[in-house]
C-alpha cells in the first residue's frame, strides 16, 4: 500500500474477510489515545482478569495509568489490558466495540467489524487485509501511537507499587 495515496500496490485476497487476532489492538490503542488522557486511572475488573494468556496478570481492582496500559497493550499484546482499557473508554466491552465500529466506518473500513478489544475469536469479528492496511496507515499518523510502538521496553507499576516489566 502506498502510504501517501492509500493505493494498494499488490494484494492477494486483500478483500477476503479473516479473523483479525491481535491486530485488533491497533484500533483499541487508537481509540484510547483519542478518547482518554494518558494520566487517567484505569482499573482491572473481574472480566479483565479472566482473560486468557497472553496477559499482564494484574489482579482485580489493580489500577494503572492509561499510558502504562497502552504500553502493555502494544508491547506485549496483553488480552486483559485490552479489556480494562475497553471498559474504561467504552463503559463496557460491548460499548467499546460499538465505538470501534463507528471509527472503522469513519475510516472507510467497510469490511471490518469489531466484537472484542483484544482480537480473541468471536463470531463476526473480522476484517480484510486491505482494511487492516488502511487502519495501520491511519495509526502511523498518530505521534502518540508511534511513540508507544517504538518503545523497546518499559517497567510499569500499578497504584499499589507492583511492578511489571514489558519488553
Q: What does each model-identified segment do?
A:
Residues 92-167:
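Penicillin-recognizing serine hydrolase domain
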Residues 14-26, 60-68, 75-79, 90-98, ...:
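Soluble non-cytosolic domains of exported or imported proteins
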Residues 43-54, 122, 156-157:
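Acidic helix-start/capping segments at beta-turn-to-alpha-helix junctions
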Residues 51-87, 163-167:
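Conserved catalytic neighborhood of penicillin-recognizing serine enzymes
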Residues 34-47, 143-151:
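Short, well-structured active-site flanking segments
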Residues 6, 19-42, 132:
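Active-site SXXK
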Residues 1-11:
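A short, well-structured edge-of-sheet supersecondary motif
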Residues 7, 30, 34, 67-71, ...:
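Solvent-exposed, polar/charged alpha-helical surfaces in well-ordered, non-transmembrane soluble domains
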Amino acid at each position: 500500500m502506498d502510504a501517501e495515496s492509500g493505493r494498494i500496490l499488490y494484494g492477494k485476497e486483500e478483500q477476503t474477510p479473516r479473523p483479525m487476532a491481535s491486530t485488533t489492538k491497533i484500533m483499541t490503542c487508537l481509540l484510547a489515545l483519542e478518547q482518554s488522557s494518558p494520566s487517567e486511572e484505569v482499573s482491572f475488573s473481574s472480566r479483565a482478569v479472566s482473560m486468557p494468556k497472553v496477559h499482564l496478570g494484574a489482579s482485580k481492582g489493580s489500577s494503572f495509568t492509561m499510558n502504562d496500559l497502552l504500553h502493555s497493550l502494544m508491547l506485549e499484546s496483553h488480552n486483559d489490558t485490552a479489556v480494562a482499557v475497553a471498559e474504561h473508554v467504552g463503559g463496557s466491552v460491548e460499548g467499546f466495540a460499538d465505538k470501534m465500529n463507528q471509527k472503522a466506518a469513519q475510516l472507510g473500513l467497510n469490511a471490518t467489524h469489531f466484537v472484542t478489544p483484544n482480537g480473541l475469536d468471536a463470531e463476526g469479528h473480522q476484517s480484510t487485509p486491505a482494511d487492516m492496511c488502511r487502519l495501520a496507515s491511519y495509526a502511523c499518523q498518530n505521534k502518540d501511537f508511534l511513540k508507544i510502538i517504538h518503545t523497546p521496553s518499559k517497567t510499569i507499576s500499578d497504584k499499589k507499587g507492583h511492578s511489571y516489566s514489558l519488553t
